[in-house]
Structure formats: C-alpha cells, structure tokens
Amino acid sequence: MITANLSENQLLIKKIIDVSLNIILSYLYTLIIATLYCNIRAAKHIPKYNKDYVIILGSKINEDGTLTPLLKARTDKAIEFGKNQLKATNKQIIYIPSGGKGVDEKVSEAQAIKNYLIKEGIAPDRILVEDKSINTRQNMQFSKKIINETNKDAKISFSTTNYHVFRSGVIASNCGIDCEGMG
C-alpha cells in the first residue's frame, strides 16, 4: 500500500510538473510570437509625411570614417523619407545624425552621417549634429534637447535598422519623445 501511494504521489507530482511546463512554454511561445509581430509591424511602418525632424541613429563606422552598409541603409532611409515628404507636402525635413565617437573611430558617427548627407545633396543648414551619445537612449535624449532648443512642438521621426525600430520606439517613448520610427 505504501508503494502504491508513493507511485500515485509521484504520478501526481509528474502531472503537476507537466502542466506547469506546458503553461510556461505556452506563455513563452505567446511572448515570442507577440514580440515578432510587434517588431514586424514596427519595421514595416512608414511615418506620416508631416515631420519636422528625422533622427538618424548612429552605428559603428568604417575605419576611414565612411558609413558601414548598415548605417548607410539607415541614412538612405531617412533621405528617402525626406524626399518623399517634400514631394507629398512640400515640407522640408531637418536631419539629426546622432552618434558619438568610438575609441577606434576617426570621426563621430554623427559627423560621418553628416558627411554622407551632404554628399547626397542635403544642404548643410538642414543638418543638426548630435555627436555625444553612446547608446540609443542617449541618441534620443540628446537629439530631443537639440530639437527643443528650436521647436518644442516638433513632429519627429527616427531612422534605424528594421529590427531595431520597435526597441528604439520604446526607448524614445521612455525619454518623452512622441515620434514614429522607420527601418
């Protein structure tokens, strides 16, 4: 009888563990699917063409001070958005390249982006450089400070890599920035 009870207790414990694991795994699968859904939706989002500023989030640059393919894609997306907005609304956008200088970089990420913007035909007076930040939170905080110096009610967008849009949007929101991202 003791052996039978022990087996029943072991079976009960096994069932409890199985049910608990199924609940945990179901929760994790749901969390993963929800995260993927949010990231895909954010990456495919195109901001409204009513923006005053576009913050271009920095990333590592090449040794010669030029943009890596990843950073070039972010910058090209911002340029494309600015051109499309101009066509749609006749409203010029101000570009804010954002990113500090790494120890192994010749110039700041922001300066490298600015150089590329000018090379691509963007007028220097439409570029405000934020070159102190070392992470996405600082990109947003320091860029917001620059924007607030001229326009506290500005409509803002940001450009980053598609897989980074959702996370950057959350960080921007936590920094008190109402903006739309693109990637």
Say what each PLM segment does:
Residues L36, A43-G183:
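A structural signal for short, hydrophobic/glycine-enriched beta-strand patches
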